Design a protein with these regions (language model features):
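Short glycine-enriched, charge-decorated loop/helix-capping segments at active-site entrances
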Residues: 45-50, 151-156, 232-238
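Short, solvent-exposed loop/turn segments at secondary-structure boundaries
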Residues: 51-54, 88-90, 150-154, 187-191, ...
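Conserved strand-turn element in the central/C-terminal portion of the radical SAM core barrel
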Residues: 42, 116, 140, 144-148, ...
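Canonical Radical SAM [4Fe-4S] cluster-binding loop centered on the CxxxCxxC motif
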Residues: 15-61
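Conserved SAM/AdoMet-binding glycine-rich loop
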Residues: 67-175
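Hydrophobic faces of well-ordered beta-strands that scaffold small-molecule active sites
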Residues: 27, 77, 109-111, 137-139, ...
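Aromatic/hydrophobic pocket-lining residues that form the small-molecule binding cavity
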Residues: 59, 92, 122, 161, ...
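Auxiliary Fe-S-binding modules of radical SAM enzymes
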Residues: 1-18, 23, 203-309
Length: 309
């Protein structure tokens, strides 16, 4: 299937839908509308009041219509919107099973998730969800620093993320954690604490048994409508320079454990100044060398005009 296609875009009004970059070729199925949280750095869901689609048969109809239209071409389905994992476990299980029934070559069903909603689900619920064919959650962690998390209205702590990751690992749900470089602002002490605590959290999230898991740092962009942009205009928040961002990335990587395994680390997102892809800690030394080169030589960095969300 070439490119994302969306079913169930809330019929009466056209909305922007957002999905992880790696879900570019997925079928997008609307299960919720908007996001359960209003983080200071995010402007993606400002036009949407959060709600859950109540009519399960209506969602199934979207899944069925997509099956008729695309046949066996659909291999990945992403459940929209900002936090589809908030939906009750039995409903998610029912929808996941139906996705597989209608799309015979389906190999991946995923969604965005908030740590608190993962923690609300029992271990048995998560295991039944995996048995139904649900495969991955994308979790916007942003930081391991509890103060930064509080300041940006994230609604979770480092402990929450560490426990949520372990619950997913144990259930067999793939974990993709997203961090946000620059979120602490340009204060050197706060920036370093943001990086070091984020590395500490990565170490705590490592699965007890071998399995692939994913970490993807992005770089803060102060987008129109976001609270953090308003804070910047009021001189309450000052963003990091590109050099500071790379120093933060260096500290984050440098403070991760050397013995991390199967952790796919990716900074290919267009917001970042450097593109790295490999494994922590197998490729840790190489990552540090490349980030150090970017710190020393601005020519190595992605130009500002090529960056974006």
């Amino acid at each position: 299937m070439q490119g994302s296609f969306t079913f169930g875009v809330w019929k009466t009004k056209l909305y922007y839908l957002f999905r992880p970059p790696s879900e570019w070729d997925s079928l997008l199925i609307s299960v919720t509308n908007g996001c359960t949280h209003r983080c200071t750095f995010c402007s993606m869901y400002l036009t949407k009041k959060f709600s859950v689609r109540k009519d399960i048969e209506d969602i199934k109809s979207d899944i069925h219509k997509a099956g008729k239209m695309f046949g066996s071409r659909v291999e990945k389905i992403f459940l929209e919107d900002g936090n589809a994992f908030v939906v009750k476990s039995n409903i998610l299980i029912e929808l996941t099973k139906y996705c597989h029934q209608q799309h015979p070559n389906l190999r991946k069903v995923s969604s965005y998730a908030h740590a608190k909603d993962i923690l609300k689900k029992s271990d048995d619920d998560l295991k039944r969800l995996v048995d139904a064919g649900f495969t991955m959650v994308y979790v916007g962690i942003e930081s391991g620093d509890d103060q930064v998390l509080k300041d940006c209205n994230k609604g979770a702590t480092q402990d929450d993320y560490a426990l949520a990751a372990q619950k997913c690992h144990q259930a067999g749900i793939d974990w993709s954690g997203i961090f946000l470089l620059g979120l602490a602002g340009n204060d050197p002490e706060k920036s370093r604490r943001h990086a070091v605590e984020s590395a500490k959290l990565i170490n705590r999230m490592a699965p007890a048994k071998p399995r692939k898991w994913y970490i993807s740092p992005l770089t803060l962009e102060m987008t129109p409508g976001s609270e953090i942009l308003a804070q910047n205009l009021e001189k309450k928040f000052q963003p990091c320079t590109s050099t500071h961002i790379l120093e933060e990335l260096y500290a984050l990587i440098g403070n991760t454990a050397d013995d991390l395994t199967d952790c796919i680390f990716n900074t290919n997102h267009a917001s970042n100044y450097l593109s790295l892809k490999g494994e922590l800690g197998k490729d840790k030394k190489d990552f540090l060398c490349r980030v150090e080169a970017g710190i020393k030589d601005p020519k190595v960095r992605r130009p500002e005009y090529m960056r974006g969300l």
